[in-house]
Amino acid sequence: DEAERLGLDAMWLAELHFAPERSVLASPLIIAATIAQRTRRMKIGTAVQVLPLCHPLRLAEEVATVDQLSGGRLIFGVGRSGFAHTYATYGVDYGESRERFAEVLTILKRAFTEEQFSHNGRYYRYDNVRLAPRPLQMPWPEIRIAAASPDTYEEVGTMGHPIFVAARTGNLSELAPLVKRYRTAWKMAGHAGDGRGAGASGRACASAAECACGCSRRGRSGSPSPTHGDSRRWPYCS
C-alpha cells in the first residue's frame, strides 16, 4: 500500500532459495498475488523466476492466475543461472540449465497462446494440453529475460523480448557494448524500435540523466532497484 502511495511504478520480486543470509522470499509469484490484492496501479514483476527449476505447466498456470488477479499488471521476468548449489539441492543438473531454460520458455509460450498443444522435448513430454486459466494480457504477460553473457544479449534481441540487465558490480558504461549487441540483434531480426529493458543495480536512479551525472542512491530497503523502459534511455546505451 505504502509503495503505491509513494508513487512507485513497479515492484520487483526475486527468487532465491536456501540462502537465509540474503533471501527474503523464495516464491515470487505467491508474493506477487498478495501484492496484487493490495494495490491497483503499479506493475508487479519477477526479477527473476529461474525457469530451469520450474515445472513449465504448473508455472504457466500460476503466471496466468497472477496476471488475472492483478488485472494484467504482471511483468514476467525470467532467468537461467541462479546458483549451482540451488540446482544441486533441487536435483537438477546445472549443466542442463541453458537447454532447460529454452524448453520451459517454449512450453510457456505455447501454453499461453495455443488452445491445445502437445510437446515432445528432451525434458518434458505432453499430449493435448489445455491451459486454464489463460493470462489476461495477450498473448502473454510481458516476458523480460535476464542476460549476463554476450551470447544471451544477442539471443534475447533476436527473440524480440525486453531484457533484464544485472549491473551489481563495475561501471555501468562497461555494459554499453553488450546492450549494443542486443539492440543490433533486435534490429537484424526485424523487430520494431530498439528494444526495451530494465537494469538491476545498487542504484535507484530517477532518470538516465541522473545516472549519467553520477548521482546514485540506495533503494528504500538497500537492495538492488531495477529501472526499466526503452533501451535508448539507459545511461549505458548512448
Question: What positions do the PLM features span?
Answer:
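C-terminal amphipathic alpha-helical "assembly" element
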Residues: 1-8, 75, 165, 172-183, ...
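N-terminal beta1-alpha1-beta2 module of alpha/beta enzyme domains
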Residues: 1-38, 42-44, 138-141
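Short beta->alpha connector loops at strand-helix junctions that form conserved
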Residues: 14-15, 48, 166-168
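Acidic-and-aromatic substrate-binding clefts and catalytic sites of carbohydrate-active enzymes
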Residues: 17-26, 52-57, 170-175, 213
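Aromatic- and acidic-residue-enriched segments that line the glycan-binding/catalytic groove
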Residues: 23-26, 62-63, 222-228
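Generic alpha-helical structural context detector
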Residues: 33-37, 106-110, 222-225, 229
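Structural motif corresponding to the early beta-alpha repeats
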Residues: 45-51
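Internal, glycine-rich beta/alpha segment that forms the wall or movable "lid"
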Residues: 52-165, 172-180, 184-195
